[in-house]
A protein has these predicted regions:
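N-terminal leader/targeting segments and the immediate start of mature chains
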Residues: 2-43, 49, 54, 79, ...
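Soluble periplasmic/extracytoplasmic beta-strand elements of cell-envelope proteins
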Residues: 32-34, 72, 121, 160
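Short beta-strand segments that buttress and anchor functional surface loops
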Residues: 34-37, 56-60, 119-127, 147-151
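An acidic-aromatic
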Residues: 45-94, 152-158
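A short, surface-exposed beta-strand/turn
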Residues: 50-53, 65-67, 134-147
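Flexible, surface-exposed loop/linker segments and immediately adjacent secondary-structure boundaries
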Residues: 86-116
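Non-transmembrane domains of secretory- and envelope-associated proteins
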Residues: 114-117, 125-133, 140-190
């Protein structure tokens, strides 16, 4: 009952809020943001650039490029690049903004108010999915997500998102350029 009142007071459904968040984050020319990842053994800070389904993630440990099909992961300490073609669950684990696509199929959604923001709760309809549950805090005026909490088989991860800006991103930044890493060993896992 309280959830129905909360949703009614917004005048929007969880899906409508997620549609607006997806539109805000999937700017055709691209966006950039900073993030902090916390949970389990994965604690790191970094930046992300997104353009459609393409992304580039930079942290102190790795740089990941994804051009919509191929992924390159550069591991700094090993000076190596792993090349792969990730599946849906691997992409969900890597890209904090992947909820843009995943909420449309295979998830039930509800919404409540938390600290003046929309809090959308997604639960998987398929017990085999790698992401079983997710909470997304969304700003009510900009529809930009500020926090994403994801439940994996090993527990919860929290991604805090900040400094989200529209950007005119070249497709080149979503590809690994071997000239920038001349000593890196390239390992093709495809």
């Amino acid at each position: 009952m309280a959830l129905l009142i909360a949703v009614a007071s917004y005048g929007q459904t969880a899906k409508q809020v997620l549609d607006k968040a997806a539109a805000a984050v999937s700017n055709k020319s691209g966006i950039t943001a900073s993030f902090t990842l916390k949970g389990g053994q994965m604690n790191d800070k970094g930046s992300i650039s997104i353009k459609g389904k393409k992304f580039q993630i930079k942290t102190s440990n790795v740089i990941i490029w994804f051009d919509g099909k191929t992924q390159w992961s550069y591991v700094r300490k090993n000076d190596e690049v792993n090349v792969s073609t990730p599946n849906e669950s691997q992409l969900q684990a890597l890209n904090p903004c992947n909820f843009i696509y995943m909420y449309k199929k295979g998830y039930n959604s509800t919404m409540a108010k938390k600290g003046g923001n929309y809090e959308v709760h997604l639960t998987s309809t398929d017990k085999k999915k790698s992401v079983q549950e997710m909470y997304i805090l969304i700003h009510p005026q900009t529809y930009i997500p500020s926090e994403i909490r994801i439940k994996h088989s090993k527990g919860w991860n929290t991604i805090e998102v900040s400094n989200v800006k529209k950007a005119n991103l070249s497709d080149e930044i979503f590809h690994f350029n071997s000239k920038d890493f001349p000593t890196a060993e390239v390992i093709d896992l495809r």
